[in-house]
Design a protein with these regions (language model features):
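Bacterial N-terminal signal peptides that target proteins for export
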Residues: 1-9
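C-terminal motif of bacterial Sec signal peptides marking the signal peptidase cleavage site
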Residues: 18-21
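Bacterial signal peptide processing site
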Residues: 23-26
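Divalent metal-binding segments
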Residues: 38-51, 60-316, 332, 336-397, ...
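His/Asp/Glu-enriched, well-ordered alpha-helical/loop segment
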Residues: 253, 378-415, 420, 425, ...
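Acidic (Asp/Glu)-rich catalytic clusters
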Residues: 288-292, 318-329, 410, 431-433
Length: 575
């Protein structure tokens, strides 16, 4: 799409060059002839200047520009090619964008970077396979990892287990019986375990379900090998303790894989949405910072353990708070789960599920944290400075989270509710009223309207309409952020942008989607004053793209490539 401001700026520049004789290339910017930078002592001399670009600033006062000048890590000029000449000196590095698009670096305020790239996972199994294929895959993993105390895997979908002819416990026991095995399902909301894992965890047929979790059982009441939600999390905690050098492997994974890949996608700021501080995750991030290896701005969301004593947990969380404004790493968020997920029939709903995987009477899902407990944490931790990232998928879970914030918050926090799959229409306006950020993920295919019918057997046709209602929430005044929940969905922001504008009837404009990935997410991370848009005085977290997103259709946006990513004015990725 042509931009009138850009056309006008280019035209004026061409006229200016014609008058001043600045060369045949009307868009060229040449440093003035001076003996040294000292000759420009009355001016600020830029260290980097970007010219001839289509710069989308996400600043409503100046949406588009041609040129950007940096002094160290700060933006000192945003405007046209002619205006930026005043900031040039002999040492200025001039980068000709050649018409490419520049925009603020992307934020992803909900992802799981440590878990997604962790070396803790020793093997992967298919999402769907026959019982025999699963047995072969798990047995092969045991042969390939002879010294592992626990076999830790990943990859199946829950329905692949629920549709087995035999109990999943019988199948996995046939593969490996002498060592504990735990396999995380793709959403991380259930685990498939063998008998040895149950034994070492102290789980038997008489065990009571833990807070926020369910031990899967067959029709006779026997354990079936599926641990739903927090029931699985507790066993995974035990499995992780068996790993030697886990922190060092996670440290290497962040530096060598995760951060480079995120920078390659144009991402400059993230929130770790589940920092397991009892697994060493916090220390891993802190070591990366200490080693001066961070290439992202990072806010950690400390995991709130649902089974832990509240007073002990609150005291510990307060002690871990870290919010140095000069640091790239901040520990200023807490991650709470209100409920589970729809496909497990554990998302908290007002009305019972039509299909009940858990065989619980009048199953309406479960709570990791009740409304009253969440209120307690809000009252205790807001004063410290924590913002809450609250997992809410079912209409009851979301409603209770809003209730807790309304009853307990002092109003200065920036709490957000994430996922937002089934939202009651009467709760739409409460997001703006309570200053609650609406965080959604649309990069995954399962949130696409074409897949809404998949949930009809679980919650009926009426509740299955309008899942993840980003358009309705925006229309009701909510501050919307878009994120990935990687590795549940791809972290590629261009997939998210493409889906956001094409998921009719809950689609939004490209400008709104970009705001959700930039300035709105910066607001959620309490850094909108320094990043999230391209403005004078802000820090230079920037990304250069191979195309103007506003001139592409939805499918073309998905194919966008990042040419360059800058954090704090320094190039952290270049194609």
């Amino acid at each position: 799409m042509s931009n009138p401001t850009m056309i006008l700026s280019t035209t004026l520049l061409a006229i200016s060059c014609a008058i001043s004789g600045c060369g045949s290339d009307s868009n060229s910017v040449t440093a003035p002839t001076v003996e040294s930078d000292g000759d420009l002592s009355s001016h600020v001399v830029a260290t980097k200047v970007f010219t001839n670009g289509e710069v989308y600033t996400v600043n409503p006062e100046q949406p588009w520009a041609q040129a950007v000048a940096l002094k160290g890590n700060k933006i000192i000029f945003v405007g046209n090619n002619q205006g930026v000449k005043a900031y040039l000196g002999k040492s200025t590095h001039i980068i000709d964008l050649k018409g490419k698009m520049m925009m603020p670096g992307f934020h992803d305020v909900h992802m799981h970077p440590l878990e997604s790239a962790s070396a803790a996972t020793q093997f992967t199994i298919p999402a769907y396979a026959s019982e025999g294929e699963y047995i072969d895959a798990i047995y092969t993993a045991s042969v390939q990892n002879p010294d592992a105390q626990w076999l830790i895997g990943y990859g199946h979908e829950i329905t692949s287990l629920l549709e087995m002819e035999r109990a999943p416990l019988s199948v996995i026991n046939e593969a490996v019986a002498d060592r504990p095995v735990i396999i995380m399902e793709q959403t991380s909301h259930s685990m498939w375990v063998n008998g040895k894992a149950l034994q070492l965890s102290g789980i038997n047929v008489n065990s009571q379900d833990p807070i926020g979790g369910v031990y899967g059982r067959d029709v006779s009441g026997k354990l079936d090998g599926i641990l739903y939600d927090n029931a699985g999390n507790q066993v995974m905690e035990l499995a992780m303790k068996s790993l030697p050098n886990a922190q060092q492997q996670d440290h290497s994974g962040l530096i060598e894989y995760t951060m480079p890949e995120l920078n390659k996608a144009g991402i400059t700021s993230i929130s770790d949405a589940r920092t397991y501080w009892q697994r060493g995750h916090l220390e891993t991030w802190q070591q990366v910072e200490k080693d001066d290896k961070l290439t992202l701005r990072v806010s950690l969301g400390l995991w709130a353990y649902p089974g832990m004593n509240d007073e002990r947990q609150i005291s510990t969380l307060k002690s871990l708070y870290q919010n140095d404004p000069q640091s790239l790493l901040k520990v200023n968020q807490v991650k709470f789960y209100m409920d589970g997920i729809l496909v497990n029939t554990t998302a908290a709903m007002h009305e019972p599920y039509d299909t009940n995987w858990l065989d619980l009477y009048q199953n309406k899902g479960l709570n990791y944290f009740t409304q009253s407990r969440l209120e307690k944490y809000i009252k205790a931790l807001e004063a410290t400075g924590f913002d809450f990232n609250i997992h809410g998928i079912g209409d009851r879970g979301i409603h209770e989270a809003l209730n807790a914030i309304e009853r307990a918050s002092k109003g200065n926090a920036r709490h957000r509710i994430t996922h937002l799959e089934v939202v009651n229409s009467e709760d739409y306006t409460r997001f703006e009223k309570l200053n609650v950020i609406a965080d959604a993920q649309v990069a995954g295919e399962f949130t696409d309207p074409n897949h809404w019918p998949d949930t009809i057997p679980l919650i009926g046709s009426e509740r299955a309409q309008g899942l993840v209602p980003i358009k309705n929430l925006l229309s009701a005044g909510a501050t919307l952020t878009l994120s990935s929940d990687w590795n549940v969905s791809t972290f590629n922001p261009f997939v998210g942008l493409s889906n956001a504008i094409s998921r009719v009837p809950q689609n939004i404009t490209l400008a709104q989607a970009i705001e959700a990935y930039t300035i709105n997410s910066a607001y959620a991370m309490r850094q909108e004053q320094v990043v999230g848009s391209i403005e004078v005085g802000k820090l230079a977290d920037l990304v250069v793209l191979d195309r103007n997103l506003f001139e592409q259709n939805a499918s073309e946006i998905k194919n966008t490539k990042v040419e360059m990513t800058l954090l704090d004015g320094e190039v952290v990725y270049q194609r």
